């Protein structure tokens, strides 16, 4: 009788010690409501994304949650970089969270985004940023700060073309040009 009681208590303890950590999991809550769950969740992971013919992106993140059927991944505490065929860094950066198109390499980033265009020596800081690798464009809504050798600017609704090096604000709040 005592063995059965001990076994019952051990089973209860085992099940009560397991919990689902919904607060720290980066899972698309709207997808979970539809019954769509991630394929895999990686912690402290490195992952390469990119198509043939484009410079792949090395992604390092505290967590990466993959939804391979839908072709995207959610990230948390991430850094990223891309190198060209000569192994020169094209761009790099960091963000608190992101949504990555794993079929291509487009990224939606938010939470203290820092994006560095290494070839042009420019750093962009924004709360959110969209990187479209197909068009080689950057879009950041809201307040954005840009710093380079040419100067420092802050403004709103930033758009950039990485092919041509043309970067514009819809409204400049303040700026400083260096004429050297």
Where would I find each of the regions flagged by the language model?
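Mature-chain termini and adjacent capping regions
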Residues: 1-180
